[in-house]
Amino acid sequence: MTGMRIAFVLGTVTGGTGAHVAMLARGGQARGLAVRVYGPAQAGRQFFPGAPAFVPVEIADRPRLARDAAAVLRLRRLLAGSRPEVVHAHGLRAGAVAAFALAGAGWRRRHRCALVVTVHNAPPTARPAGAVYAVLERIVAHRADAVTCVSGDLAARMRHLGAADVGLAIVPAPPGTAPGSEEVAAARAGLGGAGRPVVLAVGRLAPQKGFATLLAAAASWQHREPGPVLALAGAGPLDQMLRAQADASGIRMRFLGQRGDVPALLAAADVVVVPSRWEGQPLIVQEALRAGRPLVASRTGGIPDLTGEDAAVLVPPGDVAALVAAVLAVLDDPGLAARLSEAARARAAALPGEDAAVDAALALYQRVAGLPTAV
């Protein structure tokens, strides 16, 4: 496999997708692959700073005909120069751009190049974006040699659309070190939870994350004494809306902003809540399991595959009453909290890590490129 040429393509990304591509690129290079990464300059600065293997291609975050056409033409020229054996695109927009770039590549008639697409997110359904993404899904399903998905529901959807070779991607949380006791104590003090239980949520302040549902749930437990403190770590477009919701409801909470000490925050919390409308293999769930924290999360996407039925209390997404009941059950029952913590650590120990993710990707590259795979 040494010297096998792999091109990664990504669009406008935040958080997990960019980190995942960077992990695969590093792992591939460490195993002797010749790697190139194509994507927006913003992604390069955030996830590939100073990497000579990164080449800017501006793939827009929403449909823009002129920019999309320019991205296809630029990527086609770049791929003609590097002639990869496998192109691995991440996301539906990047997958469609890569498919069109390869469709017009004359060099593919002489040099085989396979297309792999990883679907990281559930597409929007509301029009007009939903109609556009439905087309992108079909392009990916019919033109990719293989499709990997971050959850079983996405994989089933791609099979339904006609994709012939569909599997599950492995998207592990990066390895981390446990915070020290002093760091945890400082985090706990900063959460304002002296004498009160702390409910923690972490994520981008965006509609998908379901934080408006969490704040509605928090309004229901304000009458309790000692009432829980809700701490929300993250930044994003809904910041002001969520602050207004908290003020209007009189919620006892702390907006923490973007934080670099999430492991300490997790260790300081009494319960971690992931109220998302949909998720694939969210890093925060994996990090909470690794920290052994009692977890309440939405039963959606790939979350149940990560937690199983014993390492989290799973509730329907958007169900305020169920979320309230689950959080209070954990806070009021030390035995339940202890069982969740023990199951979380066991579950985390069984989850595949970065080496497994890279090995699985490389085995897929060999297969779609028609190369012999190791037995």
Task: Give residue ranges: language-model regions.
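Short His-centered aromatic/hydrophobic patch
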Residues: 89-95, 119
